[in-house]
Amino acid sequence: MADLSAQDKLKQICDALREETLKPAEEEAGSIVHNAREQAKRIVEEAKEEAQRIIRSAEETADQTLKKGEAALVQAGKRSLENLKQAVETKIFRESLGEWLDHVATDPEVSAKLVQALVQAVDAQGISGNLSAYIGKHVSARAVNEALGKEITSKLKEKGVSVGKFSGGAQLKVEERNWVLDMSSEVLLDLLTRFLQKDFREMIFQSC
């Protein structure tokens, strides 16, 4: 019985020690587990929020990129349309106008009228001096002189027109003043292009 009593006492002592040491440890462990769970929950929530933020940022970036891409496409489309307009103007408008001028400005009657208009313009301004008239290299000087008549050719230094190096049209030089009044086909093409280009664009590209 004494041994049992000793064992009982030993058990009581062990139980007491366990009660004193293990219970607080269990409570501490429980608190640690609880805190860990709360912290894990908070971390998960923060991770979810961060993930949502990243997704929103990615969506915004993608949307901005898409808008920039759309804007770039629109701008590229506008540039392509403008390039097309310029190509059409060059091919249809300027080249066709140039061909028409080459035909018209090499007509002796037209060349004569241009020379006459230039001489009369100089006279109207009271400008005197030696006048030299030049016509296109593809035009007959004899035919132009006949169309002008003596009233105009008599005012020219050479008593008639000379053949120039340009295609068609006419030029008048006032030698003392070193002036050149230029109505050659090249100059006429530039003048007509500037005057008619707007009307041509509106007519051809009004729906663009």
Swiss-Prot record:
GO cellular component, one term: proton-transporting two-sector ATPase complex, catalytic domain
Pfam families per UniProt: HrpE
Parts forming coiled coils: none
Nuclease recorded as keyword: no
Keywords in alphabetical order: ATP synthesis, Hydrogen ion transport, Ion transport, Transport
GO MF annotations, alphabetized: ATP binding; proton-transporting ATP synthase activity, rotational mechanism; proton-transporting ATPase activity, rotational mechanism
BP GO terms, sorted: proton motive force-driven plasma membrane ATP synthesis
Origin superkingdom: Bacteria
Family named by the database record: Belongs to the V-ATPase E subunit family.
Record function comment: Produces ATP from ADP in the presence of a proton gradient across the membrane.
Protein name: V-type proton ATPase subunit E
